[in-house]
């Protein structure tokens, strides 16, 4: 009996070792992703295999699927200098070489165990029998440097790769078929602002991260995400701030029009929420102009309920911002006459009876009350205020329904975002193959209890 027990134990140990070795082999191509990556997305290979639209958007087309092992995950990543990358497991390097010879702009060359190519003078490609790497877009002059970077990545050991980073461990723990973990600095600035809410003053976007699971159904991409930090002190402050956000009632869920780029929804007590806004540098930059004309901080203190910020433009000079908020006891209305008298030269505040307009040169901003709703927006007359609450072309109901009951949500108008050049050159560029034909993106913030 003892001998049999020893034999079973030996078999068990052998099986464990075999599983560990198999696990290492499964991840060996992932070590090509650099440890310095600021964002990493994992896409289940089955998702790619089932969609001919994902790989067809790559610079060398969907034929590359014949040479890849789509039983393994495909990874997209952003390098520290802002380039986008892709990493995939190679199944047939000979077939991959044939495909690259037809797709490459110049001749595929060999460097040791690696093959190097460029596509359209802007994408660097490197591969061996194990991994395929793509990096770009870069200028034609920068292609040699990009290819040298690919060789270093293909050569690097696990300690120099993303596998050694907590970012990868976090990514690996997300159960969605499409998942990502990113430093907030990898996001466009305006989209990054909500994820920085609650971060301590002095913390920058490289110290705060986002973990997200992605699902697409009926043309809507839903992203369930959480902001956090690998630095305990920063993470603690982020977690503390989450209690300020209350379940959204849905008062303004139908107020976003299809002409707007994105909108942020929450439910707050303004007195508690104001310190978070004041510590968020990106949002403060947007709101600073208002504070020079009116006492926006005092307006915010009157907020108690649902609040929504929507943006139709992205430049600092023209954010095209609209704000709607449920208010209680807005005592600041008694100060409007003082604001009128205190305007700087060249500026003015006009209006009465709950509707006022601030003007400075060619720019204008209207604000006021519609019942117990505060509104503030660029260039709206009193007769047009109703269109803010009931736009003629609101976002689809199946999109707006996802907002209600959450504690913070963002809705992104995909066509408008792509049209404004926001779906390339940053982490949002990673989503481009997946958001193809998606009508809207709903990003819901989840918080630890």
Where are these regions (language model features)?
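Post-signal peptide N-terminal segment of mature Sec-exported envelope proteins
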Residues: 31-53, 71, 76-77
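Hydrophobic lipid-interacting interfaces of membrane-associated proteins
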Residues: 137-142, 173-189, 228-230, 269-271, ...
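Bacterial lipoprotein signal-peptidase II cleavage site
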Residues: 25-31
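Leucine-rich, highly hydrophobic segment in Treponema pallidum outer-membrane-associated proteins
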Residues: 158-263, 403-449
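C-terminal motif of bacterial Sec signal peptides marking the signal peptidase cleavage site
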Residues: 20-23
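Single conserved position on a long alpha-helix in the C-terminal lobe of the eukaryotic protein kinase
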Residues: 41, 66-166, 305-399
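Bacterial N-terminal signal peptides that target proteins for export
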Residues: 2-12
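Long, K/E/R/D-enriched contiguous segments that form extended
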Residues: 260-341
């Amino acid at each position: 009996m003892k001998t049999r027990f020893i034999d079973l134990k030996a078999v068990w140990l052998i099986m464990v070792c075999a599983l560990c070795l198999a696990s290492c082999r499964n991840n060996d191509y992932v070590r090509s992703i650099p440890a310095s990556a600021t964002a990493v997305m994992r896409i289940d290979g089955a998702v790619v295999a089932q969609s001919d639209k994902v790989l067809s958007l790559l610079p060398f087309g969907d034929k590359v699927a014949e040479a890849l092992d789509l039983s393994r995950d495909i990874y997209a990543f952003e390098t520290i200098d802002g380039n986008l990358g892709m990493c995939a497991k190679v199944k047939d390097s000979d077939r991959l070489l044939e495909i690259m010879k037809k797709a490459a702009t110049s001749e595929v060359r060999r460097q040791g165990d690696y093959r190097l190519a460029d596509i359209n003078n802007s994408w660097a490609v490197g591969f061996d029998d194990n991994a395929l790497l793509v990096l770009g877009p870069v200028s034609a002059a920068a292609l040699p440097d990009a290819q040298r970077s690919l060789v270093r990545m293909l050569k690097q050991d696990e300690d120099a790769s993303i596998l050694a980073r907590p970012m990868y461990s976090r990514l690996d723990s997300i159960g969605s078929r499409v998942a990502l973990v990113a430093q907030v600095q990898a996001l466009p600035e305006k989209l990054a602002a909500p994820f920085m809410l609650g971060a301590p003053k002095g913390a920058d976007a490289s110290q705060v991260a986002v973990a997200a699971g992605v699902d697409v159904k009926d043309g809507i991409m839903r992203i369930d995400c959480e902001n956090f930090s690998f630095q305990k002190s920063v993470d603690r402050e982020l977690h503390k701030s989450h209690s300020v956000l209350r379940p959204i009632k849905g008062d303004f869920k139908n107020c976003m029009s299809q002409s707007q780029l994105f909108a942020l929804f929450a439910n707050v007590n303004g007195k508690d929420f104001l310190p978070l806004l004041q510590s968020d540098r990106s949002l403060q930059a947007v709101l600073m102009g208002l504070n020079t004309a009116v006492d926006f901080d005092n307006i915010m203190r009157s907020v108690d309920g649902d609040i929504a910020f929507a943006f139709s433009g992205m430049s600092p000079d023209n954010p095209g911002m609209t704000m709607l908020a449920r208010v209680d006891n807005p005592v600041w209305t008694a100060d409007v006459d003082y604001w009128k008298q205190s305007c700087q030269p060249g500026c003015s505040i006009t209006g009465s009876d709950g509707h006022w307009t601030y003007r400075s040169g060619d720019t204008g901003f209207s604000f006021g009350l519609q019942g117990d709703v505060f509104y503030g927006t660029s260039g709206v007359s009193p007769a047009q205020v109703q269109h803010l609450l009931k736009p003629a072309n609101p976002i689809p109901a199946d999109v707006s329904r996802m907002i209600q009951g959450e504690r913070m949500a963002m809705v992104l108008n995909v066509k408008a975002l792509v049209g404004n050049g926001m779906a390339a050159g940053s982490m949002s560029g990673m989503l481009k193959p997946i958001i193809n034909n998606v009508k809207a993106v709903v990003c819901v913030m989840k918080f630890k209890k």
